[in-house]
A protein has these predicted regions:
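Non-catalytic cap/lid and distal C-terminal segments of serine-dependent acyl enzymes
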Residues: 1-190
C-alpha cells in the first residue's frame, strides 16, 4: 500500500465539514484523478461511506483499508481523459458507539425486538438515513460540484459502500434515482 502522503495535492481532507441536516460535522476525504491538475476536463464522482477506511491505515477504524488510490490508479491509467473523483465521507463512529448505525439506518430500530449482544440501554435508534442522504445530495454534492471540475449529472454520479455503507448506498440509489445512476453494494448488511 502506498502512503497517502505520496498522493500530494491529489488528496484533500476537509476538516469539520458541516452537516446541517444532522446537526453535526465530519471529515471529508477527496482523491482527485492523477491528471486532474494537468488538464481542464471534468470527471465523474463516486461518493463512498466510511471515508476513514478508504485511503490511509493510520486513520482507519478497522484493521484494513480499501487502498482506493492504488485501485483507482490501476483502473484508470494516467490518461488525461480517464479518472474519477472519489469523495469519502467519514462515518460517525467518533460521535458515539452507534452513531454510524443511526446515520446509515433509514428506519428506526424496533426496540421491542432484542438484538443478540446489544445493550438495550444504548441510545441506538437509527432512522437518520434519509437525513444523511439529504446531506450528501444537497450539501456535500453541491460543494463538490462547485469546487471541483465534475460532471454533476446523474449519469456521472455514483455511490458505494460496504456493510452498513452498502445498505445506505442502496437506500440512497433508490430514494434519489434523480441523482445517482450507479451504486456499489459490497457485503451489504441487509
Amino acid at each position: 500500500m502506498n502512503d497517502i502522503e505520496n498522493y500530494g495535492n491529489r488528496y484533500h481532507v476537509l476538516q469539520s465539514f458541516p452537516m446541517p441536516q444532522l446537526a453535526s460535522s465530519r471529515e471529508i476525504r477527496i482523491l482527485l484523478p492523477a491528471s486532474y491538475y494537468e488538464s481542464d476536463v471534468s470527471y465523474p464522482v463516486l461518493y463512498m461511506h466510511d471515508g476513514q477506511n478508504l485511503f490511509d491505515n493510520s486513520v482507519s477504524f478497522g484493521p484494513h483499508v480499501w487502498d482506493i488510490p492504488e485501485a483507482v490508479d490501476a483502473f484508470f491509467p494516467n490518461s488525461q481523459y480517464d479518472g474519477v473523483i472519489i469523495v469519502g465521507i467519514d462515518n460517525a463512529s467518533s460521535h458515539g458507539k452507534f452513531s454510524r448505525m443511526d446515520e446509515y439506518s433509514p428506519w428506526p430500530r424496533n426496540t421491542s425486538f432484542p438484538l443478540p449482544g446489544w445493550d438495550p440501554d444504548v441510545d441506538y435508534s437509527g432512522g437518520k438515513g434519509a437525513l444523511y442522504v439529504d446531506f450528501i445530495v444537497n450539501t456535500l454534492k453541491n460543494y463538490i460540484d462547485s469546487n471541483f471540475r465534475t460532471f454533476p449529472d446523474r449519469n456521472n454520479t455514483a455511490i458505494a459502500g460496504s456493510s452498513m455503507g452498502a445498505y445506505i448506498s442502496l437506500f440512497a440509489a433508490i430514494l434519489r434515482q434523480d441523482v445517482f445512476s450507479k451504486v456499489g453494494v459490497f457485503s451489504p448488511a441487509l
